[in-house]
UniProtKB/Swiss-Prot annotation:
Record text on subunit structure and interactions: Forms homooligomers. Interacts with ATG7 and ATG12.
Bilayer topology: Peripheral membrane protein
Species of origin: Schizosaccharomyces pombe (strain 972 / ATCC 24843) (Fission yeast)
E.C. designation(s): 2.3.2.-
Protein known as: Ubiquitin-like-conjugating enzyme ATG10
Coiled coil: none
Length: 179
């Protein structure tokens, strides 16, 4: 099954779960996603942070996520680019801001996996999970690109790195696969 076909199937699953999806084609196929997530603290109450010098102040705990999925030509694995926005329009561009949003276990993985750079789905920059870390994950799983659960399993890795920001996409895929 081609990567484009897998993206189309994934887009159907995500759309059913309320994730906005658009397949865009530049020189390659890219699935553009958008969703909103409400951050909760460890006591399941809304997360509000006090403003500090360079750390994010969440006046509104709603984070808007823009993401792009493509096939990395050099590493031959899916690649996940993302840009979170606080308060509807403030892009989070500092590593400290991203780490503040992640669960403790995700922070360790994110430290080794996250980078910021040119996003092939936009004319700007975005955060991304480096494809060499994704390749390591697939080597550990020993899963073939033709496996129908290839992208679903890959999303579990993305969720390990970016939890709780990616919870809505995990829920959408889980719900679609149960029905």
């Amino acid at each position: 099954m081609s990567f484009k076909s897998q993206l189309l199937i994934l887009a159907q699953k995500l759309s059913k779960g309320g994730i906005s999806c658009e397949l865009i084609e530049f020189d390659e196929c890219i699935l553009k996603l958008e969703w909103h997530t409400e951050l909760l603290d460890k006591n399941d109450s809304l997360l509000y942070e006090q403003e500090e010098d360079d750390i994010l102040s969440l006046m509104n705990p709603m984070i808007t996520m823009h993401a792009w999925i493509r096939d990395s030509p050099s590493f031959e694995v899916p690649q996940f680019f993302f840009q979170p926005y606080a308060n509807g329009s403030d892009p989070l561009t500092k590593m400290e801001q991203i780490f503040e949003l992640l669960e403790g276990s995700s922070q360790n993985l994110a430290y080794d996996a996250l980078a910021i750079g040119d996003c092939p789905g936009t004319v700007g920059i975005a955060w991304y999970i480096h494809p060499c870390r994704t390749r390591d994950y697939f080597e550990m799983l020993q899963i073939d690109k033709e496996d129908p659960k290839y992208l679903s399993l890959w999303l579990l890795y993305i969720h390990q790195v970016l939890s709780p920001l990616t919870q809505p996409i995990i829920k959408a895929v889980d719900d679609a696969e149960k029905s």
